């Protein structure tokens, strides 16, 4: 290899960890923003939960409110940074398929969260029973 190529590769290897940190920080920032929008007072979110309840009355607004409140509190910068600390952010992102369950409100969100925080690209198939809220979340992200 010539000197220029070697120097470029060395430079890339030195910057790669910084690039990964920046990318992961952007994902965390987007998730923190989502957490601020996950409130029972959010009209778009209310519309999505109401529409879901019309199609599947097992997923009540009260159960959604519990789940939304939980995720809103969980999606803080500090919590997310602690969560990802022991796990590497990938150098080679892959497409990861996620087929989401729909028996509990937002049960598939944890899977989406893990895929995004690891640096991969999520290809999701929301549950037909819980699709409107998940589609809202994906739209926000």
Please name every model-derived segment.
Residues 1-95:
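N-terminal Rossmann-like NAD(P)+-binding subdomain of aldehyde/semialdehyde dehydrogenases
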Residues 80-141:
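Conserved small-residue-rich beta-alpha loop and adjacent elements
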